[in-house]
Regions:
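Periplasm-facing N-terminal accessory domains of Gram-negative outer-membrane beta-barrel systems
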Residues: 22-110, 152, 157, 165-167
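Membrane-proximal, glycine/serine-rich, low-complexity loop/turn segments characteristic
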Residues: 35, 62-64, 72-73, 85-99, ...
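Transmembrane beta-strand segments that form the barrel wall of outer-membrane beta-barrel proteins
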Residues: 235-246, 265-269, 575-579, 645-647, ...
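Outer-membrane beta-barrel transmembrane domain signature of Gram-negative proteins
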Residues: 374-382, 386, 440-442, 482-570, ...
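Outer membrane beta-barrel strand-and-loop segments of large Gram-negative receptors
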Residues: 538-545, 555, 644, 650, ...
Length: 891
């Protein structure tokens, strides 16, 4: 731990030293001969002897400037040079740092026949709620797709799953030339569109894409827009890749894109077995917002192969895959403001996983341990189709989305747990169909009416077979048997419909909404034993379920929007009457629940200044459980966990409060934000577990329970013009308090996690780029009734160097170092290194790239994971070294 603190302290001192190295300032004003201020004049601080530029800036709107002077620099060794278009350049000596150095420039008399202005300094342009980054200011020759550039933009961060955030707020969409081709599956664009086809990246704050509602209904969404270059709009764009390597690896990417005003398309075929998980490209980054909008609790997958954990590594470090993805995305502007869009993909993969894990559960006076080794194979086939018709006019909006999803997944597992050998086959085939219709129309009175209708059907038949039989004493009265078969399915019909009426005014927009929703479900499950003579019977009378469920809801809502320029606010006051009926004749279960709820929500955004704002959020929400909270028969969710319910339906009161401040100074490319969040959940029941060395039984008891969560996080990003570097940092502190019952003991847990992040991206010269990122994570968990506690420290460092000696040759070297410390265990240290060389064959307009991934050939990885009183020690098999030769060309 001391070593970690020294490393963190060294990082902190490095940051401070960069700040302290500019300990003095010189300031002044720049005016013309009449005394009028000259904005945007270039002010250079130079060494009087060598004429080298020490620092520079530009004047603000009042003609003033401030220059940072390096520490321990004598004033008489410096001069200030001021340049402005149409005026003569003027140079002055500095007598001292206390007195201002003012300039009065005289206009040039001679006519300039030709003026060429070169400025390599990145500039952000602001216009209203839109901030514009010029791609060429931040790109480098090694950047192949636009996602490579977005990662380096000041104020923007990209998570490991591709989620983009601007000043710590996730973006809602990424538009392409102003059109929404992909909804929230924007990783398709960021991982495919060539960076050379994009002229600018725009950040749109307070994005309200529905024209009827603009300046009437508050939106605090943030979206990105990719501005396409003119020449890229005139032709088909494509970056093709064909690669092969050792041991038996391949990587193929064939794509064709079009970005015309009336037609946009991203269509491609990808396949690889190099650890590149193509499923990351079709991730929906805002699925939580979608589920909140449709207000439907989609049943989660119930069964699994075991408590598998994912290593905290980059995917290509540990993934054994054989992936293929056909992805088709096409948008046609039928006429002005009328669009037809088709998004479809088919994904096939075969993934292998070898890992071993020891799970330690710390109980009062006892410790339970599980040991398991698994050799897994997953074979998903995923189909997705979406048709969207959109009319988006000033007075009329129509949006209809037809969605169909089907997945056929078969998973195989060879499991060795303690003294048992088990083969598992798990089949999971979810099917989803839905149609979402939304109509908004502005009347002659300027009032707005809205009609909404959503209907869906969902089913997910699950089947898991475990063989040979194990735990005979529990499942078959001490008689040996052949197989244990668990089946589960929860088919669901759902519809949600409402009418809304909005009354806009200069100050407040009033909205009134009323509607209803109906959910109809049936949960069926059975745990069957296949005897050695192939006869089949239930494991017991309490391992079967047939639950019928109906939830009906009627609601009315009043909302008030203040869409001002300084103060934006939304107050929503919904009233809900819902009735839930559920029954299961197998357990003489027949219950009804009627509740009337009031769930107020308040959102406030106050513009402190032109670029800075304060946000407030409060949400009180009553939540009622789902059909998965009421089944009485046991379900074997994995090979060693039986779960059932004995309490009434779960009811929760969820309170969420948050406050945040966002700072931006576009002129100097400086961004920072800080947010605090508190979440309190009170429930009418509590989870209880009986844990033994052979099995874990879970059940829900009717006992009042609450959880509390506090989160504090901050981010900072600054571009240094002098160092040509984007510096970024982040910090997060989170505390979670919860209560569980384990082996009849009431255990309150407190888990605290802290994260510190520091990164830099430097353009050393036109030939050399360097990036560095360090992430320190600390997790500790303990129970008030037990003195024992766990504490884990993890440090990840990543560095990359790019070197382009000539235009046609590029070299890249990168590395990752993982360090984990947990008291009582040896330190875990891993280092991964990659290298590549790219050669441009100008005659063929083709690139050849030779790469070596994990060239140090690290083939195992150990990791520690902590949750409440459960510690998991896992060991994974890695693919090892991959050598790949790629042929890349454009069409």
């Amino acid at each position: 731990m001391k070593q970690l603190m020294r490393i963190a302290g060294l990082m902190f001192l490095c940051v401070l030293s960069a700040a302290w190295s500019f300990a003095q300032t010189v300031k002044g004003t720049v005016k013309d001969s009449t005394g009028k201020a000259l904005p945007y004049a270039t002010v250079n601080l130079k060494n009087g002897t060598s004429n080298a530029i020490v620092a520079y800036t530009i004047t603000d709107g009042k003609g003033t400037y401030i220059l940072q002077v390096p520490a321990n620099t004598a004033a008489n060794s410096l001069v200030i040079e001021v340049r402005s278009l149409g005026f003569k350049t003027q140079v002055k000596n500095i007598a001292g740092f206390d007195a201002p150095v003012d300039f009065r420039l005289t206009a040039t008399v001679n006519q300039l026949q030709e003026v060429v202005i070169k400025n390599n300094r990145p500039i952000l342009r602001t216009h209203g709620d839109t901030l514009t980054y010029k791609v060429s200011d931040f790109s480098s020759p090694q950047d192949r797709v636009i996602g490579d550039v977005i990662k380096k933009l000041p104020g923007i961060s990209v998570a490991s799953d591709g989620t983009i955030s601007y000043n710590n707020k996730p973006v809602s969409a990424v538009y392409i030339g102003g059109d929404n081709l992909l909804d929230d599956k924007y990783s398709i664009a960021t991982s495919t569109i060539p960076q050379g086809a994009v002229d600018k990246v725009q950040v749109i704050q307070n994005d309200q894409p529905i024209k009827v509602l603009q300046n009437k209904v508050m939106s605090d969404d943030v979206a990105l827009n990719l501005g396409i270059k003119k020449d890229a709009k005139l032709q088909v764009v494509g970056q093709e890749t064909v690669g092969a390597g050792l041991p038996g690896n391949y990587d193929v990417n064939l794509n064709a894109m079009m970005f015309k005003d009336n037609y946009k398309a991203i269509n491609y075929l990808k396949g690889n077995n190099t650890g590149n998980d193509v499923r990351q490209e079709v991730v929906s980054h805002n699925v939580a917002d979608y589920l909140q909008r449709i207000d439907n609790d989609v049943p989660a997958t119930v069964l699994s192969l075991g408590a598998m954990t994912t290593p905290a590594l980059e995917l290509n470090r540990y993934l054994f895959n054989q992936s293929g993805l056909l992805n088709l995305n096409n948008l046609i502007n039928l006429k002005k403001n009328v669009q037809l869009r088709v998004n479809a993909y088919y994904l096939h993969d075969t993934q292998l996983q070898d890992y071993s894990q020891q799970t330690t559960i710390l109980l009062p006076g006892d410790t339970v341990r599980y040991n398991e080794t698994q050799h897994n194979r997953f074979r998903p086939d995923i189909f997705h189709t979406q048709f969207t018709l959109k009319v988006n006019q000033d007075k009329y909006y129509l949006n209809d989305v037809l969605l169909m999803d089907y997945s056929h997944t078969t998973s195989y597992s060879k499991l060795n747990t303690d003294s048992s050998m088990i083969n598992q086959v798990f089949k999971d085939n979810p099917l989803n169909f839905s149609n979402e219709f939304n109509l908004i129309k502005s009347l002659k009175s300027n009032n707005i009416i809205e009609a909404y209708s959503y209907i869906s059907y969902f089913a997910e038949p699950e089947n898991r077979v475990n063989a040979p039989g194990y735990n005979e004493a529990i499942f078959n009265k001490n008689i040996p048997y052949a197989q244990l078969v668990q089946n589960v399915n929860v088919p669901t019909w759902y519809t949600n419909n409402y009418l809304s009426f909005k009354i806009p005014s200069d100050l407040v927009t009033q909205s009134f909404r009323t509607g209803f929703s109906v959910q109809s479900q049936t949960l069926t499950s059975a745990l069957n034993v296949v005897q050695n003579n192939n006869s089949i019977n239930l494991a017991s009378d309490s391992t079967i379920n047939h639950v019928n469920w109906t939830k009906k809801k009627v609601y009315a809502e009043a909302a008030y929007d203040l869409p001002g320029t300084i103060l934006k606010a939304n107050l929503t006051l919904p009233l809900t009457l819902q009735q839930i009926d559920y029954s299961d004749g197998l357990y003489t279960l027949n219950k009804s629940l009627t509740r009337f709820h009031f769930d107020p929500r308040l959102r406030v955004k106050y513009q402190v200044s032109a670029e800075n704002y304060l946000t407030l959020l409060y949400n009180y929400r009553n939540q009622i459980g789902t059909i998965e909270n009421v089944y009485r028969g046991y379900i074997l969710t994995d090979y060693r966990t039986l779960y059932a319910n004995s309490a009434d339906l779960t009811e929760r009161q969820n309170q969420l409060a948050a406050v945040g401040f966002n700072y931006r100074k576009a002129l100097t490319l400086f961004f920072w934000s800080i947010n605090a969040l508190y979440n309190h959940i009170a429930a009418n029941n509590i989870a209880s577990s009986v844990i033994t060395n052979a099995l874990q039984k879970g059940i829900v008891f009717p006992y009042p329970n609450s959880t509390d969560s506090w989160t504090l996080n901050g981010t900072i990003s600054k571009y240094s013009f002098a160092l040509r570097t984007t510096f970024s940092g982040a910090v997060q502190w989170q505390s979670n308090r919860s209560v569980e019952i384990q082996n009849n003991a009431l255990l309150p847990f407190n888990t605290i996690s802290q994260m510190f992040n520091l990164s830099s991206d430097t353009k050393v010269s036109d030939q050399v780029n360097f990036s560095y990122k360090a992430t320190l994570t600390q997790t500790q968990s303990h129970s008030d009734v037990d003195a024992s506690a766990y504490h884990i420290d993890q440090l990840l460092q990543q560095a990359t160097v790019n070197y382009d000696p000539v235009e046609s040759v590029q070299f890249k070297l990168s590395g990752e170092h993982y360090f984990t410390r947990q008291q009582g265990n040896p330190d875990l240290k891993y280092f991964f290194a990659d290298a590549s060389a790219k050669f441009r064959i100008s005659k063929w307009k083709t690139d050849l790239e030779l790469s070596a991934v994990n060239f140090l050939n690290v083939k195992t990885y150990n990791a520690l994971y902590l949750s409440a009183n459960t510690l998991m020690e896992s060991s994974y098999t890695l693919p090892g070294r991959i050598i790949l030769l790629k042929l890349m060309f454009n069409i």
